[in-house]
Structures are given as C-alpha cells and as structure tokens.
C-alpha cells in the first residue's frame, strides 16, 4: 500500500479511537498511566523532518510491498523474519535525542493514549493471527520499550537501537548508527520464529535509506543468512489485524 493511502487510513483510525474515548468517557487504568495529551503533529520528526520530502521520506512513500494479505501472513507464520517497528504514537513529535536521559522517562517523548492502544492492537493481532515471536528487542527509550511491552509482554533493551545524541547527524554519525543496527537486521531468527525490533526512524533510515513514517509503522525484513536482508512489506498498526 502506498504511503498516501496508509496515512489516510491511519488518521481515520485515530479519529475513531479519539471519538470512542470521548463517547465512553473512559479513564485509562494501566499500571503505568499513559500521557493524557492526544496531540498529533504534522511537522517535525525525531530527526527533524521538514515540509518537503527528504530522500528517506520519498523512499518510504514509494515503497511497494513484495507480499501482502494472506501471502504475507503465511510467510510470517512460518517465521524467519525480522519485524522492525518504529515505536507507537507519542504525545508530540519532536527530536529529543540531545537532552533525553534514557533512564528518565520524564525527559523524553512519551506514548500518548493512542500510542498505548496502537501497541495493544498490534499485540492482539499477532496473537490472533498466530504470528510466532521469538526475541523482542527495543531501544532504551521509554516509548520504544513500552511499545514492545504493551504489544508483546517482553523486551530486551539494546543501546545499539538508540539515537546518537546529536541534533544534526554527520555522514560519519549516520554510518555509525548503520553499523550499530545492521547486525540486528541481518541476524536470522530461531527456526519458526520472528524477531521483533522496536526502535526509531533515523536508526532504520541509516541502514535502509527509508524513513519509516508515521509512528507505529513496521517494516518486515527477511535476512538471507549471508549478511544481507530483503525488505518485504510495511505495515501500519491497524493493518496487522486485517492480514
């Protein structure tokens, strides 16, 4: 599905979630309370996306799924894939990598209530569709490991998925992020399992040239066992239940 179609579908879904919450006047009762703000910003990504498409954003918009629907589901049920999620929706979308303390959630962007629901919806879809999950790896940022925990009930933090603490990256810093994350993308999962990674936009772009947008988007990769991988599909949070 094209990025334009996915964006339209995402915002329709967000509108439904907000509307239902308002009608039901529900109060979240999770063990760790999600943030109350529901702001969705159209500008400014974690790495500072602008009004015009960058090369990475254009690559995301132009990406064509190699497998979709029942074919994709069947492939995932057999295992052997790495599924890289950009964390679920946050309160606001801005770059926080310079000042954020990964050990203190109050210094970071945090998941909104929509983000919490997105993560839970993803996890329910994986269970309902019987998509086997082995390792679940997240960055050390709260929005990443909370997405992983809400969706899959487990995670191991890995600093190789963290941002480098700079507002604007040099070519050398982008290369360093690529060197950090690539081993996770090319590692073949255990037989019959899929590896889930929950990270960030710039990290994925450094290794693939694709800026994963919007938040909550996932890319399905197939490691070939020879140090490379193939990009198979991208998925919005609500698309998993439709496979």
Predicted segment positions?
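Bacterial N-terminal signal peptides that target proteins for export
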Residues: 1-11
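Hydrophobic helical h-region of N-terminal Sec-dependent signal peptides
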Residues: 12-16
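C-terminal motif of bacterial Sec signal peptides marking the signal peptidase cleavage site
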Residues: 18-22
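Bacterial signal peptide processing site
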Residues: 24-26
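Post-signal peptide N-terminal segment of mature Sec-exported envelope proteins
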Residues: 31-64
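Active-site-proximal alpha-helix that buttresses catalytic centers in soluble enzyme cores
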Residues: 55-159, 164-167, 210-243
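Generic beta-sheet signal
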Residues: 82, 190-199
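All-alpha RGS (Regulator of G-protein Signaling) helical domain and cognate RGS-like helical scaffolds
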Residues: 160-171, 178, 185
């Amino acid at each position: 599905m094209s990025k334009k179609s996915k964006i339209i579908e995402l915002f329709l879904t967000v509108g439904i979630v907000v509307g239902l919450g308002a009608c039901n006047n529900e109060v979240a009762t999770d063990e760790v309370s999600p943030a109350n703000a529901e702001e969705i910003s159209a500008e400014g990504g974690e790495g500072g996306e602008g009004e015009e498409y960058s090369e990475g954003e254009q690559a995301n918009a132009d990406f064509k799924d190699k497998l979709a629907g029942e074919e994709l589901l069947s492939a995932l049920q057999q295992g052997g894939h790495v599924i890289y999620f950009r964390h679920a929706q946050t309160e606001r979308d801005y770059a926080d990598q310079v000042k954020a303390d990964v050990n203190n959630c109050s210094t970071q962007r945090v998941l909104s209530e929509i983000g919490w629901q997105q993560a839970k919806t993803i996890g329910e879809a994986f269970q309902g569709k019987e998509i086997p999950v082995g390792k679940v790896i997240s960055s050390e940022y709260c929005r990443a490991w909370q997405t992983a925990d809400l969706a899959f009930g487990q995670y191991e933090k890995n600093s190789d998925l963290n941002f480098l603490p700079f507002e604007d990256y040099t070519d050398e810093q982008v290369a360093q992020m690529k060197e950090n994350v690539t081993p996770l993308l090319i590692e073949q999962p255990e037989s019959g399992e899929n590896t889930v990674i929950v990270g960030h936009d710039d990290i994925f772009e450094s290794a693939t040239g694709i800026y994963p947008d919007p938040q909550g988007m996932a890319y399905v990769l197939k490691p070939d066992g020879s140090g490379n991988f193939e990009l198979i599909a991208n998925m919005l949070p609500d698309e998993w239940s439709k496979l």
